[in-house]
Amino acid sequence: MSMYRAPQTDDAIAELDDRNQQIVAAAYDLLDEEGLEGLTIRAVLQRTGLARRALYDRFAGKDDLVLAVFAHTLRRAAEQFGEQVRDLPDPLARLHHIVTAIVIGRAAIDGDWQGGQRRSAALSREHLRLAEARPVELQKAVSPLIDLIATILSEGMAEGQVRAGPPSWMALLVYNLVSTTVHSQLLAEEAAIPDRQRRSELAVEIWEFCRRAIAA
């Protein structure tokens, strides 16, 4: 069985040195505390104690910082999912796990159904905006997870579980379906406590839709 790993990239957004990690960590905290409105360059500088020049040496502005948050989040997600599915019995079982985990979100890992709601809703809004404003950079940021899904689909084709087709394109379709639906759900839940039962039911519905679309 393959050892799934997030692809390595030399993209400056994805490669985080210690200073970049400090900045991205501050962005995470600000999004958790105040949502998108709280994520300003001034707030990041105050939180990190960095000089303005030190931040602008790494990020041209707020959009680049948000892209770095996406890149870091999706790369870590791909690594975690790769480890989680490594011992599952077949490609469809592995993809099922990933789709379900994306829909359920943070609670799939630590059982916290309320943590990170502001951040998740804020990032959903930014994902939709950056898909139009910075599509190439956003695609690079999310590519580790799409590449992982493509690898699993390719193996599913080899084992006769997944219909023949271009794995990368099919992976993009799966990701877009899942992520767009999750964004809508997160924005609907922004001012409320997440509905655990509804989220679980949604995961089942989305997986069934994906399964029927890719099944051999």
PLM ranges: what are they?
Residues 1-7, 104, 143, 147, ...:
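C-terminal peripheral helix-coil segments that are non-catalytic and often amphipathic
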Residues 16, 20, 66, 70, ...:
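Amphipathic, non-transmembrane alpha-helical scaffold segments
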Residues 16-27, 44, 69-73, 77, ...:
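Generic hydrophobic, amphipathic alpha-helix propensity
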Residues 22, 30-64, 68:
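Helix-turn-helix
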Residues 26-30, 101, 105, 177:
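Short amphipathic alpha-helical elements of helix-turn-helix/winged-helix folds
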Residues 33-37, 88, 109, 159-160:
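Short coil/turn segments at alpha/beta junctions that flank glycine-rich nucleotide-binding fingerprints
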Residues 68, 82-114, 171-174, 200-203:
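Hydrophobic alpha-helical connector segments
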Residues 103-151, 161, 168-169:
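Short secondary-structure transition hinges
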